[in-house]
Amino acid sequence: MSTLFVAGAGTEIGKTYVTAALTRALRASGRPVRALKPVASGVPDLSDPDFSASDTALLLAAQDLPVTPETVAAMTPWRFAAPLAPDLAAAREGRSLALADLVAWCETAIAAPAPGTAVLIEGVGGLMSPLTAEATGLAWLKALRLPVLLVSGSYLGAISHALTAIETLHHHAVDLRAVVVSETPGAPTPPETVAEAIARHAGVRVLCVARGGGFPAEGLDVVPA
């Protein structure tokens, strides 16, 4: 199964940038890709000009897909306006989000593309961010039983956050394919230095993605064949 879950060591650290970069790199290599962001908070209305900067719009652009009500719904069926954890954002709108429904939707989406298509599922928030009233992002990816690409930033404190997330994934026997350090604009430490420290302490494969740069070609094998 050519499916990868893109998780974050924290919130707003570059998951979508990395997912979009990986999508473009895979497509450039000749591999068909379907990238999905099933849940998103802080999403403007489709009629709002700011929607073009949303995670959903960025992933559609990486696949050369137009922004329409249909493509948006197919990419991100659970969209919430408030920039809060999904369970809180849903409650504010009088809605609910059930883990079983989310997992079922993802399983259907994974099975839909033609054989050989790489399916990327981007999580929401950090690894332990509340997802529903009872479940976290970790529970979601464990239920899907998918290999994981963990995204870290390069900000001050990113090394500790990444090592904590790696330890959590290992404790729960999750297949961690690699860590990607996504450059944090204005960070005092180069992403390569952060990546070296994470690799040294955790003994895992670590890649770097610079802001304005693409996904490294040598890292495309993080997506199972």
Curated annotation (Swiss-Prot):
Its cofactor is Mg(2+). It is found in: Cytoplasm. InterPro entries: DTB_synth_BioD, P-loop_NTPase. ATP binds at E12, I13, G14, K15, T16, Y17, D55, E122, G123, V124, G125, S182, E183. Substrate binds at S41. Pathway: Cofactor biosynthesis; biotin biosynthesis; biotin from 7,8-diaminononanoate: step 1/2. It catalyses: (7R,8S)-7,8-diammoniononanoate + CO2 + ATP = (4R,5S)-dethiobiotin + ADP + phosphate + 3 H(+). The active site is at K37. It comes from the Bacteria. The keyword RNA-binding does not apply. GO terms for biological process: biotin biosynthetic process. Mg(2+) binds at T16, D55, E122. It is an enzyme of class 6 (ligase). Its EC number is 6.3.3.3. It holds the Pfam family AAA_26. Keywords: ATP-binding, Biotin biosynthesis, Cytoplasm, Ligase, Magnesium, Metal-binding, Nucleotide-binding. GO terms for molecular function: ATP binding; dethiobiotin synthase activity; magnesium ion binding. GO terms for cellular component: cytosol. Homodimer. Belongs to the dethiobiotin synthetase family. NCBIfam families: bioD. Catalyzes a mechanistically unusual reaction, the ATP-dependent insertion of CO2 between the N7 and N8 nitrogen atoms of 7,8-diaminopelargonic acid (DAPA, also called 7,8-diammoniononanoate) to form a ureido ring. PANTHER family: DETHIOBIOTIN SYNTHETASE. This is ATP-dependent dethiobiotin synthetase BioD. It comes from Methylobacterium nodulans (strain LMG 21967 / CNCM I-2342 / ORS 2060).
